[in-house]
Regions:
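Alpha-helical membrane segments and immediately flanking helix-loop junctions
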Residues: 88, 96-102, 117-127, 131, ...
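Hydrophobic transmembrane alpha-helices of secondary-active transporters
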Residues: 34, 57, 85-109, 243-246, ...
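Entry/N-cap segments of selected transmembrane alpha helices
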Residues: 108-129, 280-307, 358-362
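Interfacial helix-loop-helix linkers and transmembrane-helix boundary segments
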Residues: 39-48, 67, 81-82, 102-117, ...
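Alpha-helical transmembrane segments
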Residues: 167-185, 295-303, 326-329
Length: 382
């Protein structure tokens, strides 16, 4: 009987119940909330489901992300090896490859002025950087946090890894993806605040057709120019444009299909679960996380406002030919931000179709956020 009792006692001590803290229960509840938002409300389900599940796993069984050095048997946890791919910036780069293979840069090529709107929206990133410095972050952690303003999860993860801010990676990634999902809620009030009803109702001329040659040359030219000026962007911009060249060349359909489907989804699973696994209670429930969430929101709002305000400038310069609403799409949440521009414009005039016009700044924002990350890496000599 003593053997049975001892066995039962050992089994009881092996359960997670006796080892969980109140913080673990809080994070488990957050994981449940994210799963609800992803499945029921369909807020970025492809990303929030794996992130939430990784969060759930690590707060029940912390050893799932333990490193080999910390493990008693010298073997790391499963998600530790996924996470190494984040630290090495492999997964974010592969995400960019897939995004490039899925992205139509036609609206940007047809209306190059969209580049300026995409650049203007990056103001939120640099304003948040200086605000983060004032809030006590060091220069590298401030840069890693401020990139959230681009509403681009992979770039946020990429820069945090490159700058050695892996301790902040979990809160940064969760904040970035959360704001991507909340674009339809956060942006409209800002857009309406800085525009008039007349401006929101402006109809833009149809975009010109883009030739196949232009589409093929675009990724080659962008890669050459951007990487010559900022070589640190080669990893992200290079992968983005390689994926797009797969798409537009028309001669490697198998590579296009693989990059935009099978590879993309595999990488999303690895990236999401490993990022979620960095959100243990000890790492996540602290004042730094609150600061990151606030700074991310400020950066995103400032970026949206800057895009809209620059859109107003272009509207004035072109004598009313550009609807300022498309400026808000300069953040790199593709295609959510462009859809929001369309929705807000349609509220004033249901016959106003802004989606394709907004896609120009939207895809420019993807390039712009990658360039902003490259600027930070160049500043810090990475």
């Amino acid at each position: 009987m003593s053997y049975v009792g001892e066995t039962m006692s050992n089994l009881l001590h092996q359960t997670a119940f006796l080892n969980l803290t109140w913080g673990n229960f809080v994070m488990i509840a957050v994981a449940f909330l994210f799963l609800f938002l992803a499945i029921k409300k369909e807020y970025e389900p492809l990303l929030l489901v794996p992130i939430a599940f990784g969060m759930l796993l690590v707060n029940i069984y912390p050893d799932i992300i333990i490193s080999p050095e910390e493990a008693s048997n010298g073997v790391g946890g499963l998600l530790h090896y996924f996470y190494i791919l984040d630290e090495w910036s492999i997964l974010p780069s592969l995400i960019f490859l897939g995004v490039g293979a899925m992205t139509d840069f036609g609206p940007l090529i047809a209306n190059p002025i969209s580049f300026l709107l995409g650049a203007a929206a990056q103001f939120g990133i640099f304003s948040a950087y200086f605000l983060a410095i004032l809030m006590g972050f060091n220069d590298k952690s401030a840069a890693a946090v401020s990139i959230i303003g681009g509403a681009d999860g992979p770039t946020s993860i990429f820069l945090a890894g490159k700058l050695g801010q892996t301790g902040l990676l979990g809160p940064i990634a969760v904040a970035a993806y959360s704001y991507m999902a909340l674009v339809p809620i956060i942006q409209p009030p800002v857009m309406k605040l800085f525009t008039t009803k007349k401006e929101r109702a402006i109809k833009m001329e149809n975009l010109r057709p883009v030739s196949k040659l232009e589409r093929i040359l675009f990724p080659v030219i962008v890669t050459t120019i951007v990487c010559l000026i900022l070589p640190t962007t080669a990893q992200l911009v290079g992968m983005l444009m390689l994926g797009n060249l797969f798409r537009e060349s028309g001669v490697v359909r198998q590579l296009t299909d693989t990059a935009s489907n099978a590879l993309m989804y595999i990488v999303v699973i690895l990236l999401g679960t490993s990022v979620g696994a960095t959100t243990s209670a000890e790492a996540f429930l602290n004042i730094t996380t609150i600061k990151i969430v606030v700074l991310g929101l400020v950066a995103f709002v400032f970026g949206t406002a800057a895009g809209v305000l620059f859109g107003k400038v272009l509207c004035w310069v072109t004598k009313g030919k550009i609807n300022p609403l498309i400026g808000s799409a300069g953040v790199s949440a593709v295609p959510m931000a462009a859809r929001v521009s369309q929705k807000v414009g349609a509220e004033e005039d249901p016959t106003n179709f802004l989606l394709m016009h907004a896609m120009g700044p939207n895809v420019a924002g993807v390039i712009g956020t990658a360039v902003a990350a490259g600027v930070f890496m160049a500043i810090f000599g990475i």
